[in-house]
Design a protein with these regions (language model features):
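N-terminal secretory signal peptides that target proteins for export/translocation
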Residues: 1-3
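Sec-dependent N-terminal signal peptides
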Residues: 5-14
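Carbohydrate-interacting regions of secretory-pathway proteins
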Residues: 19-148
């Protein structure tokens, strides 16, 4: 059986605005988050995403923060991944009209169980690989305050 499981202990528990601390994960629920409940849950204080032979995703699917817009922030996570490839999206946009309602695009910090994708900067649904592990990546806002 192929099982791809992503566990994010304290996912975004340490993510907060530089101006006023705001924890995004309470360690118990997915309050403030939106994702397919067939694939996302909280187990033992961790956010868990699963994609299995018995319960496969239909393409990429995401757990999306919906409880407000974050401006400047620090993000700190611990993760464990068993097979597969995943990542953390930031400064993302909703891909409307997609099959499962939880499809987004944007900048992604990749991680995986192997050694090919972990540490790369990826443009999900718009640019592909932006930089490889070890490359310096600098993202700047345009005149409208948006990432290019």
């Amino acid at each position: 059986m192929i099982s791809k499981k992503l566990t994010l202990p304290l996912l975004l528990a340490s993510c907060f605005s530089l101006h006023a601390e705001k924890h995004l994960f309470d360690g118990k629920t997915l309050n403030g988050w939106d994702g397919n409940p067939a694939h996302w849950s909280v187990q033992d204080g961790s956010i868990v995403g699963e994609n299995t032979e018995k319960n496969p995703t239909k393409g990429n699917t995401f757990l999306i923060w919906k409880d407000g817009t974050l401006k400047d922030f620090d993000l700190s996570i611990d993760y464990k991944i068993e097979g597969g490839n995943s990542g953390i999206q930031y400064r993302s946009f909703i891909k409307s009209g997609k099959h499962d309602g939880w499809r987004i695009g944007g900048y992604q910090a990749d991680f995986e169980s192997g050694d090919r994708f972990s540490g790369i900067c990826y443009g999900e649904a718009f640019r592909g690989i932006l930089s490889l592990r070890g490359d310096k990546t600098k993202l700047s806002l345009d005149a409208k305050g948006k990432l290019p």
